[in-house]
A protein has these predicted regions:
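Short alpha-helical segments that sit at the start of domains
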Residues: 1-4
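Intrinsically disordered, acidic Ser/Thr/Pro-rich low-complexity regulatory segments
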Residues: 72-224
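N-terminal helix-turn-helix
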Residues: 7-11, 16-70
Length: 224
């Protein structure tokens, strides 16, 4: 097949394509030959995969991990911080944190997990996860709910490895399975023991939004 003609405005096949678009919302260029070449190159590099034979290409765990490391942005909202602070000041510790968790689940459309201490956990928004097609398959849903049944043990296992700053554990890097990602941070509420706040969603979650939600919430709690 002939390549693009000079002056056509279409880059030649093989021109590197920004990997962030493979990780987030890849948009093919206007020339089909260029698009096919770039998609093929991204697939060879492990940034695009086919979940099964008849499926189209989708970003891989490697692509999402690349996006998180290179292009993650913190989107601050003073209004959200004020709402969270007001909720924390109106109720006692655990009740307030649970209310904040429900708010985050509503805003993010994901599940939110709180570890008050090693053997005391709470989660909300589980129904949000099962709206995603990834978790409508029986095996995926079973594995996820099995992990949540052992939530206290899971949080105890990762508690000491959670940083003070918000961090993102993509795919196989988190204990909830390769089809999920976890945005997690350790917080300190007044003179209480440190706790853990986490947002659990699919691999293709909105990383900027969810990271910003967890980070802002952690920062507000730490100021109490």
């Amino acid at each position: 097949m002939a390549g693009p003609t000079p002056g056509s405005g279409c880059p030649p096949p093989g021109t590197p394509h920004p990997l962030v678009q493979a990780a987030a919302s890849w948009a093919p260029p206007s020339c089909p030959a260029t698009a096919r070449a770039e998609m093929s190159e991204l697939e060879k590099s492990g940034y695009l995969i086919k979940p099964h034979t008849s499926a189209g290409r989708v970003p891989s765990e490697k692509a999402y991990d690349f996006f998180v490391k290179e292009f993650l942005e913190y989107e601050k909202s003073v209004k959200l911080q004020n709402v969270i602070q007001e909720m924390l000041q109106k109720s006692i510790y655990e009740q307030a944190i649970k209310q904040v968790a429900k708010l985050l689940a509503q805003i993010s459309g994901e599940a939110v997990i709180v570890g008050f201490k090693f053997n005391h956990a709470y989660y909300t928004g589980l129904s949000n996860l099962f709206r995603h097609p990834e978790f409508q398959e029986y095996s995926q849903a079973f594995n996820l709910t099995a992990m949540l049944d052992r939530l206290d043990d899971t949080l105890s296992m990762i508690f000491d490895n959670v940083n003070e700053e918000a961090q993102i554990l993509v795919g196989t890097n988190n204990p909830f399975g390769p089809q999920t990602s976890l945005v997690i941070a350790k917080y300190k509420y007044a003179d209480r023991e440190p706790g853990v706040l986490a947002l659990l969603g699919p691999l293709r979650m909105d990383y900027n939004k969810n990271y910003s939600l967890v980070r802002q919430t952690k920062e507000v709690i730490d100021r109490i």
